[in-house]
């Protein structure tokens, strides 16, 4: 009889812990997208830095 309440308490403690990784994955998704945007922005800045030379200023306009 003593095992049943202990089992119920353990079951209640384990149930919320099982859903936590799903919540964390939802929170990670926007972070992955913003990292991708950040990398694209860095690539754009690098290409502009390489392109913008005094001899070739026409590509700096965009």
Curated annotation (Swiss-Prot):
Identify the propeptide residues.
Answer: 20-47
Q: This protein is called what?
A: Conotoxin Lt5.8
User: What are the GO MF terms of this UniProt record?
Assistant: toxin activity
The cellular location(s) given in this protein's UniProt record come to:
Secreted
Q: Where are residues bearing Glutamine amide located in the sequence? A: 61
Primary site of residence: secreted
Keyword presence, Secreted = yes
The UniProt family comment states: Belongs to the conotoxin T superfamily.
């Amino acid at each position: 009889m003593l095992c049943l309440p202990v089992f119920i308490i353990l079951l209640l403690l384990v149930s919320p812990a099982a859903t936590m990784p799903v919540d964390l994955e939802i929170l990670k998704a926007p972070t992955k997208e913003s990292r991708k945007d950040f990398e694209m922005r860095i690539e754009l800045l690098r290409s502009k830095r390489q392109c913008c030379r005094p001899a070739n200023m026409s590509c700096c306009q965009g």
